[in-house]
Amino acid sequence: MSQDHESLENLLNEDRQFPPTAEFAAQANATAALYELAEKDRLAFWDLQAKALSWETPWTQTLQWEAPYAQWFVGGKINASFNALDRHVIEGRGDRVAFHFEGEPGDTRTITYAQLLVEVKKTANALIELGIQAKDRVAIYMPMIPEAAIAMLACARIGAAHSVVFGGFSADALLSRIQDADAKLVITADGGFRKGGAFALKPAVDEALKGQHNVKNVLVVQRTKQETAWNSATDIWWHEIVDRQSAEHTAQGFDSEHPLFILYTSGTTAKPKGIFHTTGGYLTQAAYTHRIVFDIKPETDVYWCTADVGWITGHSYIVYGPLMNGATQVMYEGTPDTPHKGRIFELIEKYGVTILYTAPTLIRTWMKWGDEFPNKFNLSSLRLLGSVGEPINPEAWMWYREVIGGNRCPIVDTWWQTETGGIMISPLPGVTATKPGSAVTAIPGISAVVVDDNANPVAKGHGGFLILDKPWPGMLRGVWGEDERYKETYWSRFKGIYFAGDGAKLDKDGAIWLLGRVDDVMNVSGHRISTTEVESALVSHESVAEAAVVGAQDAMTGQGIVAFVILRGGIAHASGEKLVTELRNHVAKEIGAIAKPRQILVVAELPKTRSGKIMRRLLKDVAENRQVGDATTLADPNVMKLISEGLNTSKDED
């Protein structure tokens, strides 16, 4: 890219702004003073946040930093499980509900902090009986049931690092993660309930364990009571070993830098990256961010994060952050459309949910289904909404605010990653004015900068690369067993500065707008255009519910823009060519003629991973007439076949 060229075009303008109400600001956990406090002395600020937790041994040094290696709260000793559970019970909060669990078939469990603590202690004792020690690794492959959180907390209690593998992953994916972490134990279930029926999990574990590994036992929760193949030499039913354990177990403190968990993210190469987090810094950031970003009032709020514990969002904002803050949560096993498309809204009404944290992909799905589903239920208990996982289009943001939030709930659009451990960029409710589609600003204590090719900060109104130029407590400590890969992946683009591949722009007010992965930037006739901006322009059209955009090779322009769109419910696909022309012109009007898609294909579904992220590389394969690459992590592998057939019959525009 030439030096005088913009790192990333800033094309889409968004002027709507929503300042906090006086009423919300008056009761908010966050204040504007937090920014000043953190700015004045960053390390003293993080010291203060760490002191909100219970430490067995205080630390002697806040930060030891030799890029790219950080140690936080050096010399301190802490137990994650004690902070999530014991201290609440000791301080008289044992009767507070920790989880309202709702199974997909409609079975429910209400679990208090005292009850959760007993279950975690018994499970910790069972792990010890199975020979698991501090520093061992345990793989967890579970449905969204309370035992998933119990297993994680029991591992943390005895100092064994957990590696949670999302229950939708294949046997091969599970085996590669078991091997990489050298897990000694796998905790799983016979299966779970999804889309109206039982699915099996144990067979994938059995299949995975045909490979090379050092797993000694498989601990199995009986969730569905389906017939399950059994190896009596290694397999143990959870209820048979856990139920008979003592409910006494004293949690010991582990070094602040003791590994807490490994979580695998897909790499560009075949081998997934084992992102590992340690204890003291991660817990500090998870608890602090959950408290200020979600304005949590543990005595009165009912909080619901719709993520799966198999993802970092489930680790930080279901298991660790909320429990450390003594929150009451909803945990739901099933899918948003079972037994009907209003299921999430029905549960918000049933449990009086006050804070909802979900993903743009689900918000756009709700838009596609139509307003009648949320409108059937009373959502007046909601007081704050959150978004996580990818940039949210302004139109989806506005719909979320108006239809779900009744125009009264602040929206926290949060940017962070598996690697960062906790939220890094987000409005603070009660303090920050929000803008549809913008994550606005780094939270107090975090330094995030948008820079050009030479690591110089860009001016307002310009785009570039998002970097984190100062260490933070929740940061990854490396890629498990692959030190060179850690340095190469995150620290090589800008020397000694963390860059994880996201593009961003600053608007005229200096607010940060995330533009997705820089790999998702298209180069059209020398203009670098973000897929996110073109997608947002398409979704702002009244007919479009969801859009995915890729750059495909083009003899004339270098790359041509190819768009795949899902129409809103009730709009006939027959509108065909007329609608396609209208959409191309709409993008030109919103962004400029340079961003006009070369081709637009109306599709029924988009290829998404099981966590809801759109797999643009597969769409790029189709757009460039290549054989479609590895689609094993797709939620629905048939989607690509249908899209390929559709694109071959659609014509290029002028």
Q: What is each of the regions a protein language model found here?
A:
Residues 81-82, 95, 99-153, 170-175, ...:
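Conserved AMP-binding/adenylate-forming core of the ANL superfamily
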Residues 95-97, 218-220, 231-264, 271, ...:
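Conserved pre-ATP/AMP-binding loop-to-beta segment of ANL
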Residues 120-121, 243, 275-296:
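Conserved structural elements of the adenylate-forming
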Residues 153, 157-240, 352, 359-360:
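Structural core segment of the AMP-binding/adenylate-forming
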Residues 165-191, 205, 349, 356, ...:
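AMP-binding/adenylate-forming catalytic core of the ANL superfamily
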Residues 239, 320, 324-327, 354-358, ...:
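Gly/Ser/Thr-rich phosphate-binding loop
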Residues 283-302, 312-355, 368-370:
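Conserved AMP-binding/adenylation subdomain of ANL enzymes
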Residues 441-445, 456-490, 529, 627-628:
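Conserved ATP/PPi-binding loop(s) of AMP-dependent carboxylate-activating enzymes
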